[in-house]
From Swiss-Prot:
SUPFAM superfamilies: P-loop containing nucleoside triphosphate hydrolases. Disulfide bonds: none annotated. It catalyses: ATP + H2O = ADP + phosphate + H(+). This is Peroxisomal ATPase PEX6. Interacts with PEX1; forming the PEX1-PEX6 AAA ATPase complex, which is composed of a heterohexamer formed by a trimer of PEX1-PEX6 dimers.
Amino acid sequence: MIGLFKDEWFNISILNDNLFLKRYCYESNNNNNNNNTLYTIIVPFDKSINPSQFDPSTINDYFIFLYKNTKKINLNSINKLQYKSNKKEILVSFDITYIHNSNNNNNNNNNKLKSVLISNSCSKKLNLFNNDIVHLKPIKKKLTVLQRVVLLANDNESFIESSNPSESSSSTTTINSKYLVNEEFRNYLVENSILFQSPNNIVIENHQKHKSFSYKVLECFPLLQGTVSNSTTIIIISPDDKILNTLPSNNNNNNNNNNNNNNNNNNNNNNNNNNNNNNNNKEEEVEEEEVEVEEEEKDNKLKLNNNLRLSNFIIHPIINISNNTTTKNEDIGDSNNLFHFTPSSKGILSNNKKFINISQLKSIPTEIDFEFDISKEYDYLVDCLVSLNTLKSLNLFNGSWIKIKNITNNNNNNNNKEYEIAIRIFSITSSLKLKDQVLYLPPISIFNLNIDYKNFLKLSNYEIISNQFELILLKSNKPNINNNNNNDSFPINYPTANRIKISRIKNQNSSGYKSYSHQLEKYFQKKRLLKQNDIIVISTKVNNEEELINSNNSNNNNNYNNNNNNNNNNNLVYFKVEIILCNQFENINGNQIYLIDKNTTSIIQEGSSNSMVPSKIESFYWRGGDQEESKDNSMVPLELIYENEFKTIVDLISPFLMGDKFSFDFNCTLLLNGPQGVGKRTLLNRVAKQMGIHVYEVDCYKLYDFVESKKDWNIRNVLEQASNSTPTLLILKNFEVLEQTAQSMQQEKKESNLSQTLINILKDINDSNTSNINSNKYPLIITVTVNSMDELSNKVRNWFKHEITLNSPDENQRFKILKYLTKNLPIDIGNTVSIKNLSIRTASFLNSNLRALIQRSSINALKRVLSIQQMMNDEIKPIEIYNCGFLVMGDDIQKSLSEMQEYQSSSIGAPKIPNVSWDDVGGLANVKSEIMDTIQLPLEHPHLFASGIGKRSGILLFGPPGTGKTLLAKAIATECSLNFLSVKGPELINMYIGESEKNIREIFNKARQAKPCVIFFDELDSLAPSRGNGADSGGVMDRVVSQLLAELDGMQKSSDVFIIGATNRPDLLDSSLMRPGRLDRLLYLGISSEKENQFKILQALTRKFNLADDVDLRKVVENCPMNLTGADFYALASDAMSNAFHERITASINGEINEEEQNQKLIVYQNHFIKAVNSLVPSVSLDELEYYHKVQKQFSGNNKS
């Protein structure tokens, strides 16, 4: 296929259906027995190529992948075409048509693409238009064979054609064979290589019968598109089959219709209420989120039955992908070309000034091509965008020059400066959902308007500022038609500057030792309109080897910059316009706009300065994070997850940035604590980017030194460097390491002088700035991050004026994170995957853990599909799996979740839901019911406790050892879907003072973060003995008991945390533990006193055994003594299995069984159990059992009282 697809890119040419059928289906000269349909693509084939490169007869062995180019380009710039191989593509069948191209024609048309021919029906199905550019790639048909296909006949005639009437009418027909297609229909599908794509309709033409039959593809498995073979399971369903009522798609369709109606109503309301404030918008978002969660929960309840989908009744679980494979049709038409005029028609339309509403423009997705979707003259970083209706109402042409004036400063400032910008205005398609009567300005243009900081923050939140800005139309000169430069059209009333001086704005990403001449030269290739104090931004991206050599001439000597500061990284560098000189015009108020033309203007870069920067400029510059350069934009938006904490930090920092209204003689210091990986550093970076201040980030491990004087010098050096680039948010990661000293590392609790060091350094810096008239007045915001407050001394903590804690995400926050992570992934949501349930099962997972979970699930899904396809054909590759498409199933996520929970639980003791059911617990029926009343009732009916009556969340299980206390606690957690945190008393005891109490606090903190959760304290008597009776002189155990009691009292406020304790000796426990409100529900787990209960225990323990037919468990139980515990019965079952092992091994050694019998499953016989019973010794003697009965009477009486 090399010769046929050597060009890869082709142009679409659409033919009328009748003409297409006549040429390429019925009367094709290429192949008299062709199977072409209206949905076949005809590819040109030049006979003049070397025949050895391509054999036309092999086309019957191939399909092709069709990839549509989403960006419009000129045919003269074919090199700009980019093919992304790891995306889902459309699988289509094809045929060839012979063409004859001479060498001369080839030489003249090197830049022209060959055309592939499709029918009008095919163009509608594939959403293709004339002159669309597509990429074609062949794939062998055998690699796309599906394992299962489910078809719904659209009419009875189609069903009769494909089904087997004789079998379906038989009374002995199984439900499986009833839905299988007949062999004639199967053979027709295989011989003609019919393509199936879910959930599309398919029309099968039978030329022999001169009929067509129509079907809807309900499912393709495991790929989302492919063909069938003789081994494929093909299911056919009648249109009037009752089984269709079980499909959840009906409910989904109704919900979608309701959602569409609601969306239409919301759009109408939005059009009528353009001036609503932001608080109302936030309330609506919260309400929508809550409604969405409620609908998700309702859907989960409804799908308890609906989840038994169609194929559950036929063969085995399938995938319903009706909601996941629908491709979004991007509107790439030229709907707004009516208002895209030629430059010669641009000019002033009206001299009236208009008050306008402005908002900050969000980053435009990379799928939108500026040149074709907006205009080739559009400057993304400067020009404004509006809706087409707004452009009409302003009586403007697309690309008109306008002046926007900030009229609020006239009232607030005494200097009466008028801050204004001159930019172009463009309209864009409705894909960005721009509101009418609003001008959307990029961050740089908003910043250069010198908006007061209060409105600056509003705009950074994408709010709309009304009636504070004035729009004035500008008259522009007519460009030279013979000049190819598109930037000749500029306003005529702005003079050209003779000289401009710019200075580099100091921050951590820019260096005074590095030259940015190449980047600046590239920036000023276009003419610019600038005024004094404007900000310009460039990227340090290196485009060629010459720039790389020049950029490496000198290195930055800063040893504390993070690793992002290398020469090959793509950071943004900001420059400020300091001085503009012009002979024709005198700059009186410093706000005159000038034209900067590199041919006549001298551009000088000199010195450095301090300034704020535009809000969210990095994500805007890199267009939302799809570029590799914007690494942080691929993160989950933590400002929406931790909304309250984010707002608190912004409110604390804002007064320090309002220098004209507030003046402080101290620094803003903020301590941020939370578990590692929760997102502390990321959240602070988001704060800085929104507020328009620089970030200076340092890892304190680089500052630490065993020599105190050197460590102090490192701290001073970092603080001085950060203060030189203000306004700066200094982030000191792992701050607790600076508290360590040589003595503290040896467990000697000696406080460091860190707080005094910080006080002295900041005092020196502030005194130096105060005495220096030329020093900048911007603030230095000091923030530190720690993983635990326990690592800091009280003296250091008191130095910080504010403390903020980031806890692990709760259930609702995890739901938001998972929704964000899965929004662009092909996940089987609603059928096998529930985001709501997944958010419940990922308790204690952090943002990084959830991201890793989704990544692992995608890999597991790819492995699953790859293994299935390779069983049928081992030539398929992962990239071809991507092209065909596949779904991430619930099993893939469950496997990844189990792996991660296993690792987390073993490494950090994170809670997880166990896998123990009631079937694993034999007997104990009365205890089960009492426990479920205590735990399950407040979970399922929380409204019953809304009146203020406290719930009873503490249970104490006591009794002889081996009676199933731990197993029962795990079963409770499993049945109630609770996370289970098992704690053994001796594990919490530590030899150092205060460490044992700290361990108890951490256990309860983990449980709160992982709620709903059960904390199970095993061997509780070793952790909480009676106070005053301990032998330790230091009173360690007394303090431990007091800490435990304090935590138990605090549990009454947490409605979803339950405490279960287990002990063999309740008489040794501190009596305060068993008062009401703590462990006030005492349950005795004793030895079974009836043979029926013993039988249930043994039955539960052997339910996974391969028992012989002669095994009678009741007879086994009759031979057992009455003082056997659950652990004794476990030993009995284990000994019986061991006896069977010994018998098998002995027979194998003696040659009594052959190899085939050795590989058979191990079977346990009656004699194995009898032998185990005869050798069993009870673990609890009769005297001990009598003692436990006395204890039961004592504490059961106390419990009743």
